[in-house]
């Protein structure tokens, strides 16, 4: 890609990172319905390893392998294409998102490996270096080494991490153990996908961008502390399938109904007005097409609010299912860690494994 000077000399220009990918962030995920179909057709054999505590049988955030009665390894991988144009911010967001899966299991990160795919002949090497630096800065913030990785020359920019963590098997939290009567608490405000769509359309101002970066680069550290609370029954993080998709996973895992109060959702600045203007990602529609038949939304809920409920979150917040009498303690753990917008957004009830929204 070139631009011309006043003398007519061709000068190479750096393309916007988001212009090099067909999607960005966790909105790149294969739609949940399509993924289920692919896995069903793959005929993967069931695995019987007594020390594999969490594998492919459930929709959990990471694999967990028991080492002894007090320690288990948590392993996950996550990567995607750019959600922003700033390379350093892209690296930070991707790394924060990858480590979130460890926190969502109640674990503590130990180390990470980088996954790097870059169009080497299209991106200046100093841009790629900034992506790597952004990822390393998050690992440093998490107190872990970025110990290596693997790279390829790819058509679209891809960056992420393999994350390795540790958890006490007795304190590990899954997304399938919610109980009837639990309240649902969301740790971060929603709207990252809508803000990223606005960014691509040049409709996002500096304040909106700053809010998006702040949310997506905030490590979900409270997960490790929440896992130690007896009243916390289930834990996951809200990412590419949107709040409804991950709430549905909680409902299916526990064979309960999840009930969401849309009026109580924490929302990033400007997101509601952008949604009312029809700004949202293609992944939002794909999410609804995949699981909409299992969602019941009250007629009073606006279309803009519905878009927010299916909005793919990149490096989204923890979704906690806890006993009602533990809610205050859970909110305090969030607040003490800088998650001041954490809020009670619903509850779990006995009933059909669906999500009900009012």
Where are these regions (language model features)?
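Helix-biased detector of long, well-ordered alpha-helical tracts
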Residues: 2-358
């Amino acid at each position: 890609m070139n631009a011309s000077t006043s003398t007519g000399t061709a000068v190479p220009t750096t393309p916007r990172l988001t212009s090099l990918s067909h999607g960005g962030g966790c909105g790149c995920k294969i739609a949940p319905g399509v993924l289920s179909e692919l896995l069903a057709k793959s005929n993967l054999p069931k695995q019987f390893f007594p020390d594999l505590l969490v594998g492919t049988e459930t929709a959990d955030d990471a694999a967990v392998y028991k080492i002894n009665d007090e320690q288990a390894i948590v392993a996950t991988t996550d990567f995607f294409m750019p959600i922003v144009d700033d390379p350093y911010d892209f690296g930070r967001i991707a790394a924060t998102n990858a480590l979130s899966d460890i926190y969502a299991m109640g674990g503590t990160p130990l180390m990470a490996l980088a996954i790097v795919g870059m169009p080497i002949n299209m991106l200046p090497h100093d841009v790629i270096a900034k992506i790597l630096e952004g990822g390393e800065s998050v690992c440093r913030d998490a107190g872990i080494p970025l110990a290596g990785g693997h790279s390829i020359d790819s058509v679209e920019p891809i960056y992420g991490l393999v994350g390795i963590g540790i958890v006490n098997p007795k304190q590990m939290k899954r997304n399938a153990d919610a109980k009837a009567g639990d309240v649902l608490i969301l740790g971060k405000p929603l709207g990252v996908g809508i803000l990223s769509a606005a960014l691509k359309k040049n409709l996002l101002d500096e304040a909106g961008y700053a809010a998006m970066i702040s949310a997506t680069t905030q490590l979900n550290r409270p997960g490790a502390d929440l896992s130690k609370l007896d009243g916390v029954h289930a834990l996951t993080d809200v990412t590419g399938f949107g709040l409804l998709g991950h709430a549905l996973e909680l409902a299916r895992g526990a064979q309960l109904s999840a009930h969401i109060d849309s009026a109580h959702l924490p929302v990033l600045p400007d997101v509601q007005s952008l949604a009312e203007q029809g700004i949202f990602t293609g992944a939002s529609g794909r999410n609804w097409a995949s699981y909409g038949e299992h969602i019941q939304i009250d007629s009073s809920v606006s279309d803009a609010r519905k878009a927010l409920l299916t909005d793919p979150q990149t490096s989204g917040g923890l979704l906690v299912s806890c006993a009602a009498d533990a809610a205050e303690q859970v909110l305090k753990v969030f607040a003490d860690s800088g998650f001041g917008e954490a809020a009670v957004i619903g509850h779990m009830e006995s009933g059909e494994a669906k999500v009900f929204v009012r």
